[in-house]
């Protein structure tokens, strides 16, 4: 493995807000002007490279991952050496200006490939938790931090959640979940598809569209509108929009520290097996983790996940379950290719 390379593992922050004026909920956080969003991202140390919106939310492809803005919810995930948690205070400030108050916060990440390269406050999970505790307002009084382990010391799932007594959600259905997949040791032949040809003369958008079709990413959810971007000389990001549900993929294809992530919102009634099979077939990872966050623990859904990927050569090596405030359950599963040891 390289001494140091690009950190693919993302940091992910999800903030929920509420307000007393029902008119605010029509656009809410989407009313924050683009210049203000740029200032938030400047604090994080990333920029917008592509953007799209529909009647439900706005999606931004960033120089380091993605940002999703709903009327009362913001999801921002960034990779590399970005300082994601420094977005919290400015986001709270801009939300307050339009009459919205923070009511929940969730921060998640995997284990960094290059932890010693991370800037403060991402130097350790303890530092991140201390920063979060000091930054979020006191009304978010129901708090919990947890490191969910696996059988491999290099793979764990870090979770911090904080909620006020008043928590509002767009989907109250217990069958709605968020799935975060992290993959390393990508098949080198498949990873080459995320390298651009030198001097191809294409824009990042057109090269991204080509990668989306070449790799079959457009077949994961054929109903989704995809906003994609290819970086030079390599790397890829995409945001998918399917009504009010998002999906996103980020790829760092370099050999030695290759990484890809897939995230989506879904329902236990969806064909989750199809989604997982397509994702695994596109990247053929040597190691993969799946984290699901939902209001209800579904053993049936977890079995579907295992049954979907085992025929493709991935064996479930560990599973951890933890409960968090506001009745959230997080399940963290790890898989490795059968040809590899844990």
Label each residue range with its predicted role.
Residues 1-342:
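Polybasic/polar functional segments that serve as interface/processing modules
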